């Protein structure tokens, strides 16, 4: 998952919203950790579950990474508006774990990644990732670099 995050970083730019979904332990934060490495941001990317959101400034001239865990939010745009994500969106890459039904109103352009673990004891590390690009931004984007 970490390597997938590094590859994903090559596609992203300021203004991008990435929504991650999958069961607990699927690898959402691990993917985001790789994304942070690929974007070259400062600080270790860890789960923002208890603080809801963390901002990781760029070490270079790239966009900062805003990492949000919406798991504990009850839903609706009101709670998300309190995080001022609409203000951060234009100059940051925003990654939201558990954001379905909560952040879609921020922008029509978003990239959704659904992470599923393979079933069975021997397949613990196998993940299946479904990538869906929505909106004009992703209509012509080549997401084939994510395969591997």
From Swiss-Prot:
Recorded GO CC terms: cytoplasm
One Gene Ontology term of the molecular function aspect: metal ion binding
Source domain of life: Bacteria
Database matches in InterPro entries: P-loop_NTPase, T6A_TsaE
Residues that coordinate or bind ATP: 25-30, 125
An annotated GO BP: tRNA threonylcarbamoyladenosine modification
Key words of the record: ATP-binding, Cytoplasm, Magnesium, Metal-binding, Nucleotide-binding, tRNA processing
Annotated compartments: Cytoplasm
Amino acids binding Mg(2+): 29, 97
Glycoprotein found in the keyword field: no
Function of the protein: Required for the formation of a threonylcarbamoyl group on adenosine at position 37 (t(6)A37) in tRNAs that read codons beginning with adenine. Is involved in the transfer of the threonylcarbamoyl moiety of threonylcarbamoyl-AMP (TC-AMP) to the N6 group of A37, together with TsaD and TsaB. TsaE seems to play an indirect role in the t(6)A biosynthesis pathway, possibly in regulating the core enzymatic function of TsaD.
Family label: Belongs to the TsaE family.
Descriptive protein name: tRNA threonylcarbamoyladenosine biosynthesis protein TsaE
Organism for this UniProt entry: Streptomyces coelicolor (strain ATCC BAA-471 / A3(2) / M145)
């Amino acid at each position: 998952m970490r390597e997938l995050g590094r590859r994903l970083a090559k596609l992203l730019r300021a203004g991008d919203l990435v929504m991650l979904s999958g069961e607990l332990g699927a690898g959402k934060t691990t993917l985001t950790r790789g994304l942070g490495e690929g974007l070259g941001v400062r600080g270790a990317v860890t789960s923002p579950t208890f603080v809801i959101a963390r901002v990781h400034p760029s070490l270079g001239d790239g966009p900062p990474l805003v990492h949000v865990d919406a798991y504990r939010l009850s839903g609706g745009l009101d709670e998300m508006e309190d995080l001022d994500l609409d203000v951060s969106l234009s100059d940051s890459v925003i990654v939201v774990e558990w954001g379905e039904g909560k952040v879609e109103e921020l922008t029509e352009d978003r990239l959704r990644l659904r992470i599923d673990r393979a079933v069975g004891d021997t397949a613990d590390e196998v993940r299946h990732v479904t990538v869906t690009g929505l909106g004009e931004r992703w209509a012509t984007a080549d997401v084939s670099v994510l395969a591997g």
